[in-house]
Amino acid sequence: MALKPLNNIWIRRQQCPCGDWKCYIRLEEDESTITKSEIESTPTPTSQYDTVFTPYVGQIFTTDDEAFEYYSTFARKSGFSIRKARSTESQNLGVYRRDFVCYRSGFNQPRKKANVEHPRERKSVRCGCDGKLYLTKEVVDGVSHWYVSQFSNVHNHELLEDDQVRLLPAYRKIQQSDQERILLLSKAGFPVNRIVKLLELEKGVVSGQLPFIEKDVRNFVRACKKSVQENDAFMTEKRESDTLELLECCKGLAERDMDFVYDCTSDENQKVENIAWAYGDSVRGYSLFGDVVVFDTSYRSVPYGLLLGVFFGIDNNGKAMLLGCVLLQDESCRSFTWALQTFVRFMRGRHPQTILTDIDTGLKDAIGREMPNTNHVVFMSHIVSKLASWFSQTLGSHYEEFRAGFDMLCRAGNVDEFEQQWDLLVTRFGLVPDRHAALLYSCRASWLPCCIREHFVAQTMTSEFNLSIDSFLKRVVDGATCMQLLLEESALQVSAAASLAKQILPRFTYPSLKTCMPMEDHARGILTPYAFSVLQNEMVLSVQYAVAEMANGPFIVHHYKKMEGECCVIWNPENEEIQCSCKEFEHSGILCRHTLRVLTVKNCFHIPEQYFLLRWRQESPHVATENQNGQGIGDDSAQTFHSLTETLLTESMISKDRLDYANQELSLLIDRVRNTAPANCLYQP
């Protein structure tokens, strides 16, 4: 059996982060996964016949293949299989007779026994069954058709039930998607029996219910072994040549675009290991919205043996923007460290405030080493998607009960409460020695809600943003059938996003006012349509909350139906500072419904300026680096000036006194700049 190439060189990463190289996770969202209903359906090619009656002499078919499909479908439902026997042809008509017979028709001819001490005796399934269907070709007025000339449905053996007939060789098929998965697992060192068990687990079927048996998998792997070896040698050579082509493309792009940056590493044999690149628009976007970064490592290339890492940011309209790409030779801490170092260097030394990733111990260590002052957050959705692969087989029927306990665990109010509940949970389900449970516990500070609530993540943990990243990546990898196209596809996506960003405010209309509150109208004139819609939703929900002012100053806010816990809000009218125990503003940069409710109760008609973050405003701080003739300044002066103005604006907006002082000093500074003679012009007008 020949090795079939993969449909796409980029596939979802399935290696489990637990450290066991033989452990894989099931991808529940993988579209190629065959559902249980598909497994239970007929594994032969889809038949056009919904209802099949017993064939009869004189029945007419357009082609002999159509007749074979009809008879095969009839046999499948009747409890046997068929095979093609004799065919007869002539010079004028070609093949004019076809004989289809029961799989147990005829008798095996005696074979010469091998010259071995204990020859293997194999009992033949053929028993002289008379089940058959003979076809004859007839041509009438130049049109040929086939009719049944003989038919017998008399069998001298027992017909099989449906759960047995599916195991006949004629109906045992390994589909293309399963072939690819089997080869991946075999290459990773999985024995055949474990491959079968893993496929049963992934497809959610009971043991023995796959459309093929262990013997078929063993034969398939054996047949493909030589092809796999040849394919590995070919792909090694192809990876080297494609990598060099990618570097040449990067070099050419850097010559055409001075803002494009790239870098690579080589091994001791001077062969390229890792490659990274970023576009000028990405670097400029990071200077505005580089506070939160998502590092996605969902895709890897099996043929190339490379991991694709993509850095994303989120702009003031809630859109994902590509910041940079890396191709890594492996998933080690060393490779991730180089990726992070290179990314920070591309972004001119600026570290993000928060970085969000999948759960991975190597990546966790690299972030702790290279970004010690950056908050590391693991997507909860990524953890939840792995729970079934980690624990469903171990816990069996108790898995759903475990999931309920885990969900309750995530609602722990503090770390001490989590520690107590965690010990009870793992002890109750016997998971104390489990490596996946140990992985979760070791990374708890990065995914536990009560631990990450104070980390600023903008709106990157929303389902809408995650869907936009998935869609972005799918567009890139679907069109990237080689490394060079990966560079081109990512460039197209960055260019399209940058073009859209220039028009996004005129294109997006603001939601109409819903509460008629002065605060709502005030925010509408400051925030982008996206940020305003998020804040507006909190305003609408705030009217459902009751407020009780305590004697010592704080406010207790709770839902009128007490559907959730109470929140403590502290309001300082002198400094116009407000804080809520839910930490929503610290988490997303948008005031929560609890604080908005307190502001309303205290007759505040405007939201304090410091609670309109620069990143969510209509006009983000941006100093143009191009003159009217389109000529870029091109040095680090503009970037330095940009950073200074951004810092100045951030610090000035903290209080009214600071803002007044900054305005006064800036007016004097502008006058001085205007009166300074331009000794060295940065560009010619």
From Swiss-Prot:
PROSITE patterns from the UniProt entry: ZF_SWIM
A GO molecular-function descriptor: zinc ion binding
UniProt keywords, alphabetically: Metal-binding, Zinc, Zinc-finger
Pfam families for the chain: FAR1, MULE, SWIM
Annotated zinc fingers (SWIM-type), start-end: 565-603
Residue span(s) of domain FAR1: 69-161
Segments forming domain MULE: 292-388
Highest rank taxon of the organism: Eukaryota
GO biological process: regulation of DNA-templated transcription
Family statement: Belongs to the FHY3/FAR1 family.
Official protein name in the record: Putative protein FAR1-RELATED SEQUENCE 10
Source organism: Arabidopsis thaliana (Mouse-ear cress)
Lineage start: Eukaryota, Viridiplantae, Streptophyta, Embryophyta, Tracheophyta
Gene that this polypeptide is encoded by: FRS10
